[in-house]
Amino acid sequence: METIYTFNGEDITMLMCVVIREVIREIAKRENLNFEEAFNDFYRSDTYKTLRETENALWAEPAGYIADMYFAEKQKKQVVCA
């Protein structure tokens, strides 16, 4: 597997893939979406962009916590657009 994500010089690509999958599953479950729909929504989010910045160690948080961040971001955007 190609190294995509690192933290302190260590390859965490596999771990990030697992974390991302679990976050997407949580989003799909809460929103009653299929995996692909949740995948597309999450990958367009600022939360995903933050998660990709591995030095902040957001990837070490539980998937539910990261999903909560995503939903807070989504709610904030809905309020701004309303």
Task: Pin down the residues of each PLM region.
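C-terminal alpha-helical interaction appendages
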Residues: 1-82
